[in-house]
Swiss-Prot record:
This is Capsule polysaccharide export inner-membrane protein BexB. InterPro entries: ABC2_TM, ABC2_TM_bact-type, ABC_2_transport. One of its GO terms (molecular function) is ABC-type transporter activity. Residues 37-258 form the ABC transmembrane type-2 domain. It comes from Haemophilus influenzae. It is found in: Cell inner membrane.
Length: 265
């Protein structure tokens, strides 16, 4: 193919795949290095954090306060919340860390954001699968009731993480101070993510307010898949899908608008 020739959709897709793969490898090496366990930190990092939380709940004997398996309760809420929180935090620095690469005509601003969010989602997903499998094998938690329903919930929340990451990155690009305080703001959002409560246990008025937050629907859905009919959940798949698509569309528009003013350095 000669320079300047138009590419087919298949060729463009192949080029895009190579760009994302190269950015992923660069991000992994830059963040984790080539020595020791290297890229394995990608999922070891979230796994260790989740392990710490689970052990804390285990040794304070949280099961004394509920008939529900509290380790399973934590595992079906906290890791998912950390996925979208970490993804949005990492998205903020994606452009500044890759400015020099924007000289390449096939590398776009959107690619750098997508790569970082994809890395966080992949790491959180691997850690979640491994840790839940280990906990089931050592009989600390029961096997999930509906794995497929859980996978759908996780996928929809991964979409939420991408959309949120695009929006947060776009805002931080326009207002530098926002990028510095988002880490704190996202931490404050954790209590309303649904990670630490069931909507069913809230007062009726609080339930109606809580169900306006998309991440609560994702958590409720994930827990419904794990616990089955032993718990009462209030997820709306339709609301979560519409919210994800709205965030993605808004995020893409915002990134497109500010990308025009980003100059390689």
């Amino acid at each position: 193919m000669q320079y300047g020739d138009k590419t087919t959709f298949k060729q463009s897709l192949a080029i895009q795949g190579r760009v994302i793969n190269a950015l992923l490898m660069r991000e992994i090496i830059t963040r984790y290095g080539r020595q020791n366990i290297g890229f394995f930190w990608l999922f070891v990092e979230p796994l260790l954090m989740t392990f710490f939380i689970v052990m804390m709940w285990k040794f304070i004997r949280a099961d004394k306060f509920s008939t529900l398996n509290m380790i399973a309760f934590v595992m079906t809420g906290y890791p998912m919340a950390m996925m979208w929180r970490n993804a949005s935090n990492r998205a903020i620095g994606s452009i500044s860390a890759n400015l020099s690469l924007l000289y390449h005509r096939n590398v776009r601003v959107l690619d750098t954001i997508f790569t970082r969010v994809l890395l966080e989602v992949a790491g959180a997903s691997i850690a979640q699968i491994l840790f839940m499998a280990i906990l089931v094998m050592i009989d600390w938690i029961d096997a999930p009731h509906d794995v497929f329903y859980m996978l759908i919930a996780w996928f929809l929340m991964a979409m939420f993480a991408f959309g949120l990451g695009l929006i947060i990155c776009a805002i931080a690009q326009q207002f530098d101070v926002f990028g510095k305080i988002w880490g704190t703001l996202s931490f404050v959002l954790l209590p309303i993510s649904g990670a630490f409560f069931f909507v069913h246990n809230l007062p009726a008025q609080a339930q109606s307010i809580a169900l306006w937050f998309p991440m609560i629907h994702g958590t409720e859905m994930f827990r419904h898949g794990y616990f089955g009919d032993t718990v009462v959940t209030y997820e709306s798949i339709g609301f979560l899908v519409v919210s994800d698509l709205a965030l993605l569309l808004l995020g893409l528009v915002m990134v497109k608008n500010f990308s025009k003013g980003v100059e390689p350095q």
